[in-house]
Amino acid sequence: MTTESIIDIHAHVFPDEIAQKATDSIAEFYSMPTRHSGTAGLLISQYDEAGISHGCIHSVALTPHYIRSINRFISETVKKYSGRLTGYAAIHPGAEDIPGLIDEVKKMGLKGFKIHPDMQKFALDDPDAMDMFGRIEGKMPIIIHTGDRRFAYSNPKRMKKVLDAFPHLTCVCAHLGGWSEWEDAWRTLASYENVYVDTSSSLYALTPEKGREMIRHYSRERVLFGTDYPMWTPMEELKRFRELHLTDDEEERILYRNAKEFLQLT
């Protein structure tokens, strides 16, 4: 497989004027340093360095107030770097007129949604969140930050309630199904055929042997490569992934083919 055939499913970008402030907030939230300021221009240069051909970008609306400005920015960024990026829209359970928002982001060329319950401070199985999932189900996919032992908002057990209620909700449970809760995640989520997982912000905390084991608990058709830029550089995450020593077929699927099909890239 050539290095030109790599897709990153999980990258965050911010407007240049607030990028450093935004990434500093992320670093504070996780008590971990970020690698870069989180601008789209720097992401593209990092992709070029790592040999990554395409990325899926998104940002999180901490309150409903920020949804539309974020989505405009993501849409404009995708257009600016035509062919290199797919955009996922921000959404929040407190948003008004979610059906209207779905229509709006489709017209903007955005292909799905992204949520981060721990930062947005809602539980996955809250009534408003369940209503949101019901309105999204069958219409657009969603990337969900799952897992964090410090909180109870997005743990695998709550995610299971969502999946049981909405069997046609196509979702990516980020960070191998549950950041810092990897064992609970695969035991709880791996059997759901509508669930994908990504590798972002997981491999740094797992030995190559454990990372390989975690990935193989899921169907190889439903694992996607993610960098979580700007938490890590694309080169760092790609190096960690290569150190897993997966089979050629597993690498090709996870680094490229699965995401190509998931994002419906031509």
Show which residues each predicted segment covers.
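Catalytic pocket-lining loop regions of alpha/beta-barrel enzymes
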Residues: 111-112, 121-224
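Histidine-centered divalent metal-coordination motifs
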Residues: 10-16, 116, 145, 175
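Mid-to-C-terminal alpha-helical segments outside catalytic/metal-binding sites
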Residues: 2-12, 18-54, 103, 219-224, ...
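Active-site gating/metal-coordination segments in enzymes
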Residues: 53-54, 62-143, 148-150, 191-193, ...
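Short active-site segment of divalent metal-dependent hydrolases/proteases
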Residues: 13-14, 148, 178, 231
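A general structural detector for well-ordered alpha-helical segments in enzyme core domains, enriched
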Residues: 42-46, 70-77, 100-105, 128-132, ...
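Short beta-strand segments
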Residues: 8, 56-59, 90, 172-174, ...
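Conserved, mostly hydrophobic/aromatic
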Residues: 10, 47, 74, 105, ...
